[in-house]
């Protein structure tokens, strides 16, 4: 048992490298070994332990960067670094362990491999909503490096793509058990499935060239270090950096700043004066991330993470409040039990908003606004977006430096564009900022920690809603049925050939 434990930990660590920015796809084969070990376990407790150890390694290498965010204010939160580095993998590993336990109980089933894949995706889905949810680094994102491979998201969503990836990745497991007839069936089924999604993706990209609206946007990326983001001494420097990057003689319709670009209320007279000076200079509307409150005091006071639009005459065209808040970052869960303050600036917890669409009548533009990690929740993005024209995602990933985190966040976010057939304008404080078309193609972008701006036209959305945007995760049944049918027919053909 000792050697399997060590190998599970090492292979789990390796498997976490299948995501951005490394996309080490050969590491997906580690899942075949896990699938084999679960089937050969002597009891469910052993399967649980092996799955847990693999899962711990998987999440440790995949989301290690969260501890970097905690270390930004190391003098206040030094004690939280080990909890961020090890605590989250310790918790998330239970989901891998649970999928292995359930799979163990069907280890003798003819379709054990197929059921193993189902349980893996089922517990990815559970992970996406339980305890507020964290659907980060779902295994389907291993394919997000390729425009072609992610096109099926418009039908089956990320959980459907996860099923494809886990199925292909574990199809080598009969090699370890010397079940070579089954190995032939699984490899052939995987090859057919991969060929189908490659063909579908290629044809879809060819048949849908990018079309553009006439709305021109300017994405501003100041790359302000997180240690200076909320500094009173740096406030005016940071504001003027935003303004200087936004000013240009080229005509523009919308200037877009990142999450918390304004760290004070916009209507402070001296701040508002600078903003209106900019907007009149460029003759444009500003969309920015900022903070907002309900103008009440005492126990009724509420603070929001916001996105709002300002006209050059000072009118606020819309205000959106973030509804998926980051636990421990923007609010403290179990506050009565845990006597700690949140990791972000200030002592007051942020309050949840209501979500939904916002409108810019002047441009006849309906926007699905997303702040920060709201973009990682497929169902949240899909909800109430039937009439949306564009997704605008503002975020601040400066917490995580040059780690894997900002790259993973970018690829996760652009997957929402493909799922919903909507273009995305993504503006990040330190990158990666980009204009993305409804098929996930990156039209223009600013790299991590680049200080610059880009101008571009907003791409048009697709002519009709995607299957996923209409029906949601129920569409995963399509790919499950397809793969099962191919598997069954090939298996039956193999049996008949023996007879």
Swiss-Prot record:
Annotated TM spans: 9-29, 50-70, 77-97, 114-134, 148-168, 183-203, 466-486
Pfam family membership, one: LNT_N
Name of the top EC class for this enzyme: transferase
Record carries keyword Ribonucleoprotein: no
Domain CN hydrolase: 220-464
EC numbers: 2.3.1.269
Active site: 259, 322, 372
CC terms in the record's Gene Ontology section: plasma membrane
Lineage of origin: Bacteria, Pseudomonadati, Pseudomonadota, Alphaproteobacteria, Rickettsiales
Biological-process GO terms, alphabetical: lipoprotein biosynthetic process
Cellular compartment(s): Cell inner membrane
Pathway info: Protein modification; lipoprotein biosynthesis (N-acyl transfer)
Keywords: Acyltransferase, Cell inner membrane, Cell membrane, Membrane, Transferase, Transmembrane, Transmembrane helix
Gene Ontology terms, MF aspect: N-acyltransferase activity
Membrane protein topology class: Multi-pass membrane protein
Gene3D superfamilies in alphabetical order: Carbon-nitrogen hydrolase
Record keyword Transmembrane present: yes
Job of this protein: Catalyzes the phospholipid dependent N-acylation of the N-terminal cysteine of apolipoprotein, the last step in lipoprotein maturation.
Primary location class: membrane
Protein's name according to its UniProt entry: Apolipoprotein N-acyltransferase
Family, as annotated: Belongs to the CN hydrolase family. Apolipoprotein N-acyltransferase subfamily.
Origin superkingdom: Bacteria
């Amino acid at each position: 048992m000792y050697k399997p434990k060590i190998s599970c930990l090492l292979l789990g660590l390796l498997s976490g490298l299948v995501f951005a920015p490394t996309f080490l796809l050969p590491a997906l084969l580690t899942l075949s070994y896990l699938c084999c070990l679960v089937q050969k376990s002597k009891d469910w407790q052993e399967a649980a332990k092996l799955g847990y150890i693999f899962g711990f390694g998987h999440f440790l290498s995949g989301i290690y960067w969260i501890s970097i965010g905690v270390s930004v204010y190391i003098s206040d939160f030094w004690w939280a670094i080990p909890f961020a580095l090890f605590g989250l993998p310790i918790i998330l590993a239970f989901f891998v362990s649970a999928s292995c336990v359930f799979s163990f109980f069907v280890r003798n089933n003819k379709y054990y491999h197929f059921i193993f894949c189902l349980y893996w995706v089922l517990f990815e889905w559970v992970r996406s909503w339980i305890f507020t949810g964290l659907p980060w680094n779902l295994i389907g994102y291993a394919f997000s490096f390729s425009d072609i491979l992610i096109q099926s998201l418009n039908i089956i969503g990320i959980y459907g793509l996860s099923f494809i990836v886990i199925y292909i990745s574990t199809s080598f497991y009969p090699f370890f058990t010397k079940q070579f007839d089954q190995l032939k069936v699984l490899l052939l089924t995987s090859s057919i499935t991969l060929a189908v999604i490659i063909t579908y993706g290629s044809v879809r990209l060819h048949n849908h060239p990018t079309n553009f609206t006439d709305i021109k946007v300017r994405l501003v990326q100041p790359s302000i270090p997180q240690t200076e983001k909320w500094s009173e001494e740096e406030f005016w420097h940071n504001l003027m950096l935003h303004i200087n990057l936004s000013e240009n003689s080229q005509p523009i319709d919308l200037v877009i700043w990142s999450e918390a670009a304004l760290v004070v209320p916009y209507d402070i007279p001296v701040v508002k004066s600078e903003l209106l000076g900019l907007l009149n200079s460029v003759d444009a509307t500003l969309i920015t991330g900022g903070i907002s409150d309900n103008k009440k005091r005492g126990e009724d006071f509420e603070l929001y993470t916001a996105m709002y639009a300002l006209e050059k005459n000072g009118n606020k065209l819309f205000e959106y409040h973030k509804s998926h808040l980051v636990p421990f970052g923007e609010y403290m869960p179990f506050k009565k039990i845990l006597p700690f303050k949140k990791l972000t600036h200030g002592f007051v917890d942020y309050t949840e908003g209501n979500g939904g669409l916002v409108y810019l009548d002047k441009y006849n533009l309906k926007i699905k606004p997303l702040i920060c990690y709201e973009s990682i929740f497929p169902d949240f993005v899909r909800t109430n977006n039937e009439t949306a024209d564009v997704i605008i995602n503002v975020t601040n990933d400066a917490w995580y430096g040059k780690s894997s985190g900002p790259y993973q966040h970018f690829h996760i976010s652009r997957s929402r564009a493909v799922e919903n057939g909507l273009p995305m304008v993504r503006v990040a404080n330190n990158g990666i900022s980009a204009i993305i078309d409804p098929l996930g193609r990156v039209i223009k972008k600013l790299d991590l920690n680049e200080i610059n701006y880009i101008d571009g036209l907003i791409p048009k959305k697709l002519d009709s809603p995607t299957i996923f945007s209409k029906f949601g995760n129920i569409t995963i049944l399509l790919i499950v049925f397809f793969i099962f049918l191919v598997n069954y027919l090939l298996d039956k053909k193999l049996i008949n050939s023996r007879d």
